[in-house]
């Protein structure tokens, strides 16, 4: 098992998670005793204990006082916060994971974009004013696009959408910088921003679904043109 990690805790976490992913510690099984596991991984028991607590919070493990640590079925117990971990565990499946991420974000954003213009059009106009001074580069577009979604999710009146977005953040930032490295993708996105700005200025929330649908189709086609050249290292966590 080859693991790239910056320190003992990171190594231990990646070792255990990869062992779960590769079914060496299958769902429902009991982890080795703390002393045995710390010797196996090569970390102190204190470090291991901290790692186990963190993995339990993320849904990988079940820790109960006085009982051995049990491996969970993470598909049933974890949240969006493990998206980046899954990408790191399965780099070959990264393009498909991104497809699924974009589809999920698109479905959710359809709701809060419309709701934000309906309930708080002034806030939408305010944040979209930033497009007129937006630097024409990948980093600026990726940053602005995430900020736009975050602001509109808040403006929709349902803060749960913000929590969903937070789960996408790390992975989306990686993909966003790659997507917006394309001049054609930036131009497509700017046209969408301008149309959205006009709807917000007119307080026309009724036409938002049609705009989102059209943009989803066009950006989806753009992504398909770009995904085959997706750098392999993008699926790897650097931590």
Swiss-Prot record:
It holds the Pfam family FadR_C. One of its GO terms (molecular function) is DNA binding. GO terms for cellular component: cytoplasm. Keywords: Activator, Cytoplasm, DNA-binding, Fatty acid metabolism, Lipid metabolism, Repressor, Transcription, Transcription regulation. Multifunctional regulator of fatty acid metabolism. Homodimer. This is Fatty acid metabolism regulator protein. It comes from Shewanella frigidimarina (strain NCIMB 400). The lineage of its organism: Bacteria, Pseudomonadati, Pseudomonadota, Gammaproteobacteria, Alteromonadales.
């Amino acid at each position: 098992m080859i693991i790239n990690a910056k320190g003992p805790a990171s190594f231990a976490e990646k070792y255990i998670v990869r062992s779960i992913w590769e079914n060496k510690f299958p769902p429902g099984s009991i982890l080795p005793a703390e002393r045995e596991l710390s010797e196996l991984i090569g970390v102190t028991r204190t470090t291991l204990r901290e790692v186990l607590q963190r993995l339990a919070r993320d849904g990988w493990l079940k820790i109960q006082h006085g009982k051995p640590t049990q491996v969970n079925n993470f598909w049933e117990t974890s949240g969006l916060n493990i998206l980046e971990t899954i990408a790191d565990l399965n780099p070959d499946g990264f393009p498909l994971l991104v497809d699924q991420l974009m589809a999920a974000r698109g479905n959710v954003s359809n709701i809060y974009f419309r709701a934000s213009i309906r309930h708080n059009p002034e806030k939408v106009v305010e944040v979209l004013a930033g497009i007129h001074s937006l630097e024409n580069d990948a980093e600026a577009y990726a940053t602005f696009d995430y900020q736009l979604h975050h602001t509109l999710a808040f403006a929709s009146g349902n803060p749960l959408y913000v929590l969903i977005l937070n789960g996408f953040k790390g992975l989306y930032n990686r993909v966003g910088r790659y997507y917006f490295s394309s001049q054609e993708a930036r131009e497509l996105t700017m046209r969408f921003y301008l149309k959205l700005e006009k709807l917000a200025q007119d307080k026309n929330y009724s036409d938002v679904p049609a705009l989102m649908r059209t943009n989803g189709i066009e950006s989806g086609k753009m992504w398909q043109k770009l995904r085959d050249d997706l750098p392999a290292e993008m699926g790897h966590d650097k931590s």
